[in-house]
Amino acid sequence: METNFGYRAMALSSSSFSPSIFLLLLSSLPLIFSATYPNNHLHLSSTASFPKLQAEKLIRDLNLFPKEPFNSAAPDPSFLAPKIVEKRFNFPHLDYSGPSSEELGHHAGYYRLPHSKAARMFYLFFESRNRKNDPVVIWLTGGPGCSSELAVFYENGPFQIAKNLSLVWNNYGWDKTSNLIFVDQPVGTGFSYTSDDEDLRHDEGGVSNDLYDFLQAFFAEHPQFAKNDFYITGESYAGHYIPAFASRVHQGNKAKEGIHINLKGFAIGNGLTNPEIQYQAYTDYALDMGIIKKSDYDKINKLLPQCAQAIKKCSEGGGDCVDSYVVCNNIFNQIMNIAGDINYYDIRKKCEGDLCYDFSNMETFLNQKTVRDSLGVGDIEFVSCSSQVYEAMLVDWMKNLEVGIPALLEDGIKLLVYAGEYDLICNWLGNSRWVHAMEWSGQKQFGASATVPFLVDGAEAGLLNSHGPLSFLKVHDAGHMVPMDQPKASLEMLMSWMQGKLAMTETKERVAPQ
């Protein structure tokens, strides 16, 4: 899912992750291991041990572990050319009594990544239910290594999965106001695959280059959308992906590398972007929300200097980046040792079931033969969260991705950071702090901006600060996954932001027609 930081179903053993521990989204359970990582490749000791905190209940009854640690397939000579292979599709079990599949414009495809040995990236593209000249929006789920199909079926996609595995239309899908792309990335995630593990990515440079190459091929395949406004969105660990991807697109445009991509903005929902600031906010948020007591707060805060020092070593050389992951996640783990069975994605709820939420219907649905045939994915088993992709990206975890954002703001590319108020793991407080601490020409004015209500149907749905291209929105009554918890508000947020009207306080309804 999303760090969620994706939704991570991941655990560690001597060579990869073992189903003895399950990490969902950005969830970080206690982790103690010895590691060496020459050339940015991580090798975990077989002596790795994990406290039993929530481990068994996280894996019980949910079969999200793939047979392989990441999706792989034998090389196919017909796939050697870097190109898009795409088909229009209809999902079974969905009422298509309205427009035809041709009119709907639902596409599934694979892209052969040029800077790889055998990697193919899977994507879904849903043309707007409104106007074809609506903006093109790409959504990235976190993990790292978790499939964007989690968002398709549980957040902002066109459909929702019913208990009987039938599909119903999502009245607040983001395809009601945009031409919407979901990508399984990095390679090895979801239906994306490779036959060579050297294609796995270890940093945002590799991730952003792959996404940029994909966009170039996508707009070459769909030139009628190339001049539309373009926005990058996502949540959780995508707080890393999104700034790097936006910078890569902007760099490509300035260098005139290929098709000009009309990048207008990027939005990060409950993301991990500046780990040093955000990890320091854990105890403040936990104390404010009554999760820990003052004595706990004082004790856990003694870990903060060690975390800050580990992040500094990571940023200066990279050799200690896995160590910084271990050291800093001890802060979160100490809080969870006290909190017990709280749902760290929504502290109003108990963590019940596997991932604190039950997403097992999606796994069952996507592995049905009729669905796989419809999507054209052949015999590839759907992987919700790839353990090996997650492991490969650990050296990237504690990197600060905020550093590239000011240059984008100065060039007029707008940023929306939004966060549900009841999420612990990527809480609104930490996100607000890095946004306010970011140095750019409008920093002082943004810090002095009035906090105004964000209204939906005349009712306050959040609190907004905004100046120039930068906006921060604290969303009421939502946890880690805002589009799932507040679907109407999230659609209104997207529409208003893309139209430059997010700071408006009028009660006028702007949600797309039903």
Language-model region placement:
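Terminal and linker regions of secretory-pathway proteins
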Residues: 2-514
